[in-house]
Amino acid sequence: MSRLRLLIILFFISGFAVAQESVSHLPALDEASRVFEEGKDYFSYQEPITLPPRKDHRIPIQFFFDYDCRVCSSAQDILELYSQINRDRVVLTEYPVATAKTRFSATVFYSLQALNADNLSSALLFETAEKSQYTKLSQMDNLLTWLGRQGIERNRFLQTYTSEQIKQQVDEAVRLTEDYGVFTFPYVIIDGKYVLTASTLYNDDYALAVLDFLINKKQ
């Protein structure tokens, strides 16, 4: 190898090393390094909700949703991913938002649970993210047709939907919605104290970083 060629190679190698060193000293722009602010990135109850203690000491994350929701499906994906990554630290539970006059989502959700079709609840949440689709599928005949295509028999679903067991579960959903002051959806409560809404849950990296920040505060 000629001396000139060797010098050229060494020049490029040294230049690459300097560039690597310069990059390594750039400040990290990682979401995880941020300090998040109450009232901006998350909210807090003035009086935290008292939850029963868990024997496994995992922190509860309560996810309130509605099928008529543009952000709820992506929020569910974020929360499920976070709970899977941190299964030894947190436990995720889903609750449908319900009021005395708006019981549809809760009744459908608990009916699908009773039929061991939780996966269809998630599919329906995704399907109804668009307002036009929710308007369509909130009509029972259209919903039954959609469920039939997913393998749910019409009469079996209707029998479950109108059962006393489901009515009682929906009544409990109404109570929780009122007691927890759920005023929007998605609405996420962390350990009965911290609250996340669509303003945080619209972005996965941002939401995951805020979740980590709040869970670390609780431990």
Show where each model-derived region lies.
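Bacterial N-terminal signal peptides that target proteins for export
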Residues: 1-6
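Bacterial N-terminal signal peptides
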Residues: 7-15
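Generic anion/oxyanion-binding catalytic loop in active/binding sites
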Residues: 8, 97, 129-132, 146, ...
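Extracytoplasmic thiol/disulfide redox context detector
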Residues: 17-101, 174, 219
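N-proximal short alpha-helices
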Residues: 52-55, 98, 130, 143-146, ...
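Structural alpha/beta surface segment adjacent to cysteine/selenocysteine redox centers
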Residues: 70-144, 213
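C-terminal cap of thioredoxin/glutaredoxin-like
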Residues: 152-219
